[in-house]
Each structure stands twice: as C-alpha cells, then as structure tokens.
Amino acid sequence: MTRIGTPLSPTATRVLLCGCGELGKEVVIELQRLGVEVIAVDRYANAPAMQVAHRSHVINMLDGVALRAVIEAEKPHYIVPEIEAIATATLVELENEGFNVVPTARATQLTMNREGIRRLAAEELDLPTSPYHFADTFEDYSKAVADLGYPCVVKPVMSSSGKGQSLLRSADDLQKAWDYAQEGGRAGKGRVIIEGFIDFEYEITLLTVRHVGGTTFLEPVGHRQEKGDYQESWQPQAMSPKALAESQRVAQAVTDALGGRGLFGVELFVKGDQVWFSEVSPRPHDTGLVTLISQELSQFALHARAILGLPIPVVRQFGPSASAVILPEGQSQQTSFANLGAALSEPDTAIRLFGKPEINGTRRMGVCLARDESVEAARAKATRASQAVKVEF
C-alpha cells in the first residue's frame, strides 16, 4: 500500500531526480501534485526541473563519488534518472545497498550505451533489429561499413539527441562520419555502432508503462527527426493491426527484460506489418511530449503513478494530437518569447516553455501542442503555433 507523507517533514516521501531537463520538469510537477518532496540534481544551475523542485544540487553527473555523496545526504526513497549521462556503476552499487533506482539500476546501465541494449534485444531476446557492428578504431569501422554496405548509419555508443550520428551514402562520407561520431560521444572519443540501413516507412515511439497492475501500452506516437533530434510528433500513428501487435510484443519483451516500474519509450521502425527494434529509454521520451495534450494522464503523470506504486486503471486519449518544437538558434542568457497570443489563437492549442537558462547555438526551448479532427490537421496546427512564436535574444 502506498503511503505519501508531508513534504519537508519527517514523514516526507522523497524522490531524487538525476537530470533536470524539460522532461524531468514535467515529472517533478506531477510528483509535486501527489505531495512528494523532490530533490533535483544536474550539472548546471537553474535547470528546468530545478525551478519546480523543493531544492537542488549541482554536480558532475558522471562523478560517482559526488553522486553518492548527494544521495547519501538526501536519503531519497526513489532515485529517478532523467538522462543517460550518469555514473550508472554508482547507481548499481547504491541499489545493492538498498536504494530504489527507477526503473532499475540495470536498466539505466544497459540503456546508457547502445551496445548494452542492442546486445540484449538482438542476442538475448532475439528481437528483429538492423544488422550491426561495433568498432573502436577507424580500421575496424571501415571494415564494418564495407561489410554492411551503403547506405548505413554510424553513431557513438554513448550519445543522445542525435549527437554524433551520420548517414553514410558512399565512401566519400567515411572519414567525415567517423570524425563526427568521435566528437559527439558523451565520453569523448570512443566506440561506435555501425548499423545497416533499414528501408522503413515510418518510426514510432511506443510508450509503455510497467505499473503495479501490469503493463499498459499507450497509442503509438509517430515522429519526424532531423539530424537525430525530434522536430514534431503526433498521436496516434496509423498502423496495421499486425504491426501494432508486433510492436507491443517487442516492447513487452524489452521492458520485461529491463524490469522495474515506470514509463519506457520504445523506439521502433515499421514497414507494412514488419517491425524492428531501434532503442529504448527507461523514462519519459521527448516525442511523448504530445501526451501533454493528447491524454488525460500524460506520460509524466503515468511515470509518477508507476514509480509510487499507484494504479493506472485506464488511459484516456482525447483524439488526434501533435507537438512541434520551438528550436531557435542563437546565444543568450535571457531569452524571451513573443507573439504568444498569436501562437495560442486557435482552439485546442497549448505551449510549454522550458525555462532553460541559456542558449548557445541550436537548442530546444519549448514545444507547441495541438488537437484537431485528424492527425494531419493537428500537425499543421501545432506547426503554425510553433512558427508564430518569436524568440528574442
């Protein structure tokens, strides 16, 4: 039975969030609604989730000693990773010592790098994936590309938001793609995955919730990527009953293997009735921001319920919905957003501004949300809203 105490008192139920981006911010808001005391931790001050948490700490998230010190001082009931770049070996140690890591420390460790999760999916679970090789050197990488053929995709084994990811179309791209992958890895230069290109029709995120009552699948989320980073998403993505059933089978297998409770974002490629596993995040997914307008309980609310052991009897979908990112390019520590009235002038629209403290280059600073009679109309409406927002540096 779940019991939640009073925040900032001896009975408080404490959650420590590792990583404080826009997704973490929404998770904190949902936990706050349930009377949970939230401690936010990230590598920079005034990160979005810190702005709505009870208190915060700034540390190097890859420093296991610093991470352990904060966790031992705060004594949280739940440790909730919101990003991949964390000292996961320390989380494994802490879990073995009795701390509760969401969904599990093993899940955060396996999904922190593409090799762990790919080997689990393809080699242990025998799920369909693209053909792949791993390489540590330019020589091995060149051999892998020759073996897989063109086109193929290269990514650092440890990166996020498309950093270091390239599509190789010919030998002319070989050196450039290698250099870009070496620059884009979270741990600096290192290992890469080379994947044979799948001729898919579309890709989806199947948001999957493991909770006290079992596993619940949300309506599939379609999305459009540029340079590995999401630009817009929509729900539901139309797909054949066979493809949907296969997507749910793959998602169930992966999330069961990872274990624990919480929401997972399972990324899949689809062509006709065929489905291939791509990646999984053991936490809310950026493409799932659309659920802020498409569902009665967003992915963030569902994650909070699952973490706390609360039931999820039903997930109500409000109809065709879409999200479009606000993705400016510039430099500022005091960004402003104007023309919001125009952006919100149509019915069934909403905006989330993330409150990121600075921009230096291209950065996702917000998202526009819309509902309509069809997915196409919702996408067009969300895009109109996003384009109406004027970003001032």
From Swiss-Prot:
Binding-site list for Mg(2+): 267, 279
Matching SUPFAM superfamilies: Glutathione synthetase ATP-binding domain-like (SSF56059), PreATP-grasp domain (SSF52440), Rudiment single hybrid motif (SSF51246)
Keywords: ATP-binding, Ligase, Magnesium, Metal-binding, Nucleotide-binding, Purine biosynthesis
Coiled coil: none
EC number: 6.3.1.21
Domain ATP-grasp as annotated: residue spans: 119-308
GO molecular function: ATP binding; magnesium ion binding; phosphoribosylglycinamide formyltransferase 2 activity; phosphoribosylglycinamide formyltransferase activity
Catalytic activity: N(1)-(5-phospho-beta-D-ribosyl)glycinamide + formate + ATP = N(2)-formyl-N(1)-(5-phospho-beta-D-ribosyl)glycinamide + ADP + phosphate + H(+)
Positions contributing to ATP binding: 114, 155, 160-165, 195-198, 203
Pathway: Purine metabolism; IMP biosynthesis via de novo pathway; N(2)-formyl-N(1)-(5-phospho-D-ribosyl)glycinamide from N(1)-(5-phospho-D-ribosyl)glycinamide (formate route): step 1/1
Pfam families for this protein: ATP-grasp (PF02222), PurT_C (PF21244), RS_preATP-grasp-like (PF22660)
NCBIfam families per record: PRK09288.1, purT
Subunit structure: Homodimer.
Alphabetized HAMAP family for the sequence: PurT
Functional summary from the UniProt entry: Involved in the de novo purine biosynthesis. Catalyzes the transfer of formate to 5-phospho-ribosyl-glycinamide (GAR), producing 5-phospho-ribosyl-N-formylglycinamide (FGAR). Formate is provided by PurU via hydrolysis of 10-formyl-tetrahydrofolate.
Protein name as annotated: Formate-dependent phosphoribosylglycinamide formyltransferase
Organism: Pseudomonas entomophila (strain L48)
